[in-house]
Amino acid sequence: MLGHRPSGHANVSGTVRRFAVVASGVTPTNRRLLEAARGLGVSASLVQPANAAAWLRPGDVALGRLDVLPSLDGVEPGLYALRRLERAGIRVLNGPAALLAAHDKLTTAVQLGLAGLPHPRTVHVAEGRRPHLALPVVVKPRFGSWGRDVVACRSRLGLSHCLRRFRSRAWFRRQGALVQELIPARGRDLRIIVAGGEVVGAVERVAAAGEWRTNVALGGRRRAVDPPLDARLLAVAAAHSIGADLAGVDLLPDGSGGFVVLEVNGAVDFTDEYSLGGVPVFQRAVEALLAGGYAQADEEEAQAAGAHPSWARA
């Protein structure tokens, strides 16, 4: 059954010299990824972006885990460090192009559209320009996370007030905002962890009472879930569309039994509760990452079973 495939990747300890998480901080997720690699017999360390080129050599594997910031200003040095690793012949997972696409929600929207994947209609709006989308809409920054400065607007007056308020924000003056079709709130969504082209973990997130956003930072709750096949295939396709090796894909139910991609998170944090089928999510993620490439095991198994996702038939 999809999601309950036993952990069965080939032994990676003989093919990977060292595994490095390239990041500025030891977050719980980064620490658990390193522990999982060591549990597989692989030498693993956290490496600061500025030190990565001096520390890593061909035969090593580097996983880019750059912080989510409200602009590109603090991200560019990390992207440059990952680019240097690529040029040195080091295998980089979540490389600079993928992380940039995930960090910038406008680029994410473009890539999802080019891949033909379901995503809320999205336009970019800058100061002095009025968006042309049917109401209701969501206004959000191009960069950032945790639901900050994300506002639902259900009237033209509300939208005007929101944009007027955002004009005082430095981020809006620099990069504008996104105005996005509001998918009717159903109080829940899915976050699916994709690693190396495989679904390795998932939770359902439930919004707090009176809140339409499901972010845990805003009081939302989450519980482990085995996502349906359509959701799995869509999550793998969404991660692949931006070239992400490790990503958290947020899916909203569309009210017709299917899903739409809301966001693809390249710096996703997750916990043990995401585990599927009794296999620890961090072990499964590292195995899939070090196995290499986009195995797309879920898609291959689905094709063998004759499954055709609804969004691929649209």
Question: What kind of feature is each model-predicted range?
Answer:
Residues 24-121:
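Conserved N-proximal alpha/beta basic substrate-recognition cap immediately N-terminal to
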Residues 211-261, 282-302, 308-313:
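A long amphipathic alpha-helix within ATP-dependent nucleotide-binding catalytic cores
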